[in-house]
């Protein structure tokens, strides 16, 4: 019997990272404050999850100044998009297989 959990990507196990990638799959670029408001996360919590996704090379970070204010934006990389689609496919397959057993 195949273990369907093998295809679940650990980088997307948390609700926060799943939310971050979901937003970035819909929007090309999103700034820190927009992610924070939409996902209802604290600055520190969001920053740590963004850092983990950046280290996995699933997101790209762009820092710039708008006037005198810093602005950080995030976007999903191609490898991040691929990994996220594969994760969603694995979840879907897991759900479908569990429904067959009912």
Go through each PLM region and give its residues:
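Residues within the DNA-recognition helix of helix-turn-helix
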Residues: 49
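Glycine-centered, phosphate/nucleic-acid-interacting loop/turn motifs that mediate DNA/RNA or nucleotide
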Residues: 57
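Short beta-strand "wing" residues that participate in macromolecule-binding interfaces
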Residues: 61
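Amphipathic alpha-helical dimerization/coiled-coil segments
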Residues: 2-5, 22, 81-102
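Basic, amphipathic "hinge/linker" alpha-helix immediately C-terminal to the N-terminal HTH DNA-binding motif
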Residues: 66-87
């Amino acid at each position: 019997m195949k273990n369907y959990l093998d295809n679940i990507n650990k980088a997307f196990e948390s609700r926060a990272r799943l939310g971050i990638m979901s937003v970035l799959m819909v929007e090309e670029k999103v700034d820190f404050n927009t992610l924070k408001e939409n996902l209802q996360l604290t600055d520190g919590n969001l920053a740590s999850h963004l850092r983990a996704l950046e280290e996995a090379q699933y997101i790209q970070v762009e820092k710039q100044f708008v006037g005198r204010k810093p602005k950080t934006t995030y976007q999903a990389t191609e490898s991040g998009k691929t990994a996220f689609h594969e994760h969603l496919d694995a979840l879907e397959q897991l759900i479908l297989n569990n429904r067959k057993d009912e």
